[in-house]
Structures are given as C-alpha cells and as structure tokens.
Amino acid sequence: VGEKEVQFITDRYNKFKEIFPYLELWDKEALREKEPLLVYANKERTIDRPEPIVAMGTNDQYTTVDFGEMTKELVKAGQKVDPSKTTDVFFNSEVEEIEKIGSKFKLTTVNGTVYTADFVVVDAGAHSLFLAHKMGYGKHMGSLSMAGSFYITNGTYLNGKVYMVQNDKLPFAALHGDPDILENGKTRFGPTALALLVLERYKGGKSFFQCLKTMNFDGSIMKIFWDLLKDSDIRNYVFKNFLFEVPGINKGLFVKDARKIVPSLSVDDIEYAKGFGGVRPQVLNKTEKKLMLGEASITELEGIIFNMTPSPGATSCLGNAERDIKKVCAHLGKTFYEDQFLADYTDPEIA
C-alpha cells in the first residue's frame, strides 16, 4: 500500500519468483477480481482506495491448515505404520522435571508418573526454556512471553490470507487477515502483541512464577529491554498493542490499522475474538544482549532438544520436525528414509 511498499513488494517478487515459480504479482485490477475488499474504499464498492497497491501471491497453494486435526492424523498414521510397535500418546501429563540418568532420560509428571526415554524432544512452547533452565541448560537465554489476540468479523471479507508488509524492526508477524476455517470462513484479523507475565494464556496465574524464572532477569535482560524501548517504532508499537486490549477503545484503534487491508472496515464489522491466540516465547540472548529474531533450539546435551518457536510458529513446525527427526535417528542409530519422506510430504513440482 503506497508507492514505497509497492516498490518493495515488486522488488521482492523479482527476487523470489525463481525460487517460488508459482508466485504471481497482482496489480489493483487483478486484486479487484481476487480480493475486491482490498481495492474499494467504501462498502458499496463504488470508490477505489486512492493509494497504489500491489500484492504477491498464488492461486493454487494452500494458505490455511488446521494443525490440530493434522496432528491427530499424523499420530494415527504413526500408530498404524507398524502395529507390532507400541506408540502411545499421553494427555494431561504435564512434565515437572527431566533428569539425565546414564544414557537415558527420566521424565517425572506433576501427578508422579515417570517415563524413561532414549531421546527427548521438548516442544512445550514457552515452557521449553523453563524446563531447560531446570536442567541447567540455556542459561544464556531469557524469555519474554508475548500474547497474540485477534478480532473476527461478522461475515466473509477475504478469500485468502492477506498480510501487510512486515516491519523489519519488529519480531512479530505483521497484521494479517484470513478466513478462519473453524469459524465458517469469517475473517480473522491479527495478531496483536502483548507482553504477559505468564507462560500459558487462559490458565490464570498458574505460570506467573515460572515466567519470572524463565525471563532470567538481570542486567543483560534490562539492557535488552532498554535498547528495544529506545527505538520509537518499537515503543509506539508496544504502547499501541497494549491499547488494543483495553475495552471501550480497542476496537476503534484496531480498525484503523486493519483498514490498511480492508479500507471499508468499520467498528461494527468486528468483535474481539475471546479465547483466540496463545503465548509465544520471544527469546532474549543474554550473551549478545539482544532479542533473537526467529526460533531457537537448545541442543547442548546429547539426546535432548528444547525448541522455542516464536511467531510465526505454524509456518516452520514441520520443517523443524524434519530437522529434529534426523538428529533423533542419528542418535539412536536408526535410518531416516528421506526419499520416502519427500514423496509423502512434498509436491514434486515445487520441492
């Protein structure tokens, strides 16, 4: 949106088109057909928005995945592949402590159940670093818990996922809108970004003290916070996103930002999506005294991996799983059949 961003997207398209041959560059007229509400300034669709606009996108690739259902299907497939082997999933089994005993790991849950393992992968969101710290690893890191909230429309406003241009200074996903496949295609706008002193949202203050420990607060963490807040872009972003959570004024402020995607959007078109969005760990590197962009893994101890995936998390989760399974197989002396993996999970035309 605007000449500067149009040039940025055009340049990025020219760099990416050879790597992603299915990408297309769409001008205002193409967008009028694909995503008309991006083009029109009024609900009657009689007036165009005044700014130049362009988008980079694709017609024939998926934009949305129900990762909950996908996980269930992957578990089922894993259990069926060799019926002679036991493949169990234990729910409501919160791990309180992990210990290395000889060449094995002992995992103790809050209800006292004990499991042993030859290899452990900890994919516990904001809790991963907490568990690593309890084992004495990852002490050079701290974690800032960032919660993301969403607003949802009362009808279908977009046909596909639409992102605004990312601000390189901000380690959070840019505001975007997409049809929510679990809400009958209603459009979901977000996320906001709010720092919270918990590791898990909607669970009360249960993880408050865990969060304080995981932050690993000292002079290095203080310097990271100070350097972030010195930047006016980041400072304004933090303050504005705090206001997005304040009842009474939040919708009006949020709509002003979301209108960059849908210019005709009004306060009456959206409502705060209660119960949507969780907490992501934003990793703080105490050695380099800066906030880390992207994900972090702790692999200091042979046989265990701690993964911390900030926003955007779903984008990279399967890639991380492929990376980790290779390490697991190497450690256990097993064979990873990459050709079969690629045949099952990639499109040969774009792999």
Stretches found by the model and what they are:
Residues 55-111, 115-119, 316-329:
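Helical element adjacent to the flavin cofactor pocket in flavoenzyme catalytic cores
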Residues 214-337:
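C-terminal catalytic lobe of FAD-dependent flavoproteins
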Residues 35-81, 86, 237-242, 301-309:
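Helix-loop-beta segment of a Rossmann-like dinucleotide-binding subdomain
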Residues 1-43, 196-198, 202-208:
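Dinucleotide-binding Rossmann-like beta1-alpha1 core, especially the glycine-rich loop
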Residues 24-26, 88-90, 271-273:
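General small-molecule cofactor/ligand-binding pocket signal
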Residues 330-351:
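Active-site-proximal substrate-binding core of FAD-dependent oxidoreductases
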Residues 39-42, 99-106, 284-285:
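A short, glycine/Asx- and small/polar-enriched loop/turn
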Residues 98-211:
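Flavin-dependent oxidoreductases
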